[in-house]
Amino acid sequence: VSAPRQVVVLGASGFLGSAVVRELAADPTVRVRAVSRRPVPLPERLAGRVEVLTGDLTERDVLARAVAGADAVLPFTARIRGASGWRLSEDDQEAERVNVGLVRDLVALLAERPPGAGGPPAVVFPASNTQVGRVTAERIDGSEPDRPEGVYDRQKHAAESLLKQAAARGLARAVSLRLPPVYGPGTATADDRGVVSTMIRRALAGEPLTMWHDGTVRRDLLYVEDAARAFTTALAHAEALSGRHFLIGTGRARPLGEVFGAVAHAVSRHTGAEPVPVVSVEPPAQADPTDFRSLEVDPSAFTAATGWRARTALDEALDRTVSAVAREAGAASRP
């Protein structure tokens, strides 16, 4: 099993996209093309292995140039939050254009490939485990019927469906990886804005960590390096996985009260100060019912097919993330 030679990462300056670029660039048999609005920061040892293109991928000619000659495409471009910084609204046309339209354009470009341009490329898509919608069980394995509820989940589901149809037509070897919340060190172009890093920033500032519930709501949280490795693993197995979606996660959801407590202690280990308190507060008016439902991921189908599994322990992942966030905060405070 081997990864494709020319791999194009779209949205390569984002939090997860940049981690996947680093993972791919470490493989000398792979040529990486990193495409985004902003240049992708790379360690000096990897910079010579990556072709960097900048441009607006919602412009079809830019996308066409980006994916020309690709053996594989990983589309990480996404709009997650609305203009208010909160969840997407129904009338957010820019979000639809980025989250669905870009994949629609990609499929159209693949359909226009001339005969003899090589076999169908691998496409590994970052989906969300919440696009299943409301489920009665707290543990899901990917076999459940999908009933996506929120705008973002419906858009992810629509894009995933387009790629499954492309696989059925023989246009791509398309695989969808449905991710839980991913956390870890950010980059110069993309902070991790998820709940874990948000709480780390609060703890570093000496502020209490607030929960909208009693702390028993459980979440499966995945370290960014484990997530990036899932994508490179899926690329290497794209032929066998094509046309399907797989759940990715640790297989163990943790109570958020326990996670926040672990964050407080990780920051305490870094600073030497006492751990900040973890407290329950009233939820804001815009809180969603999904914020109060537990969800655990069973990734065994993907593990059985590829051998991948999450391998970074929570405390180790938190220590790495705390160190990175503290460095960012220190750099930002210097004149």
Task: Describe each region flagged by the PLM.
Residues Q6, D27, A313-P335:
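Amphipathic terminal alpha-helices
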Residues V7-A26:
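N-terminal Rossmann NAD(P)H-binding glycine-rich loop of SDR-like oxidoreductase domains
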Residues V50, T54-V98:
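NAD(P)H-binding glycine-rich loop region in Rossmannoid oxidoreductase-like domains
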Residues P75, R104-V151:
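Conserved Rossmann-fold NAD(P)-dependent oxidoreductase catalytic core, especially the SDR/UDP-sugar
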Residues R134, E149-V175, L204:
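Active-site Tyr-X1-5-Lys
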Residues H157, G170, V182-S197, E207, ...:
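Glycine/proline-rich active-site loop of Rossmann-fold NAD(P)-dependent oxidoreductases
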Residues G186-R193, G215-A228, R244-A266, R311-T312, ...:
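Substrate-binding strand-loop-helix patch
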Residues H237-A287:
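Mid/C-terminal beta-alpha module of Rossmann-like enzyme folds, strongest
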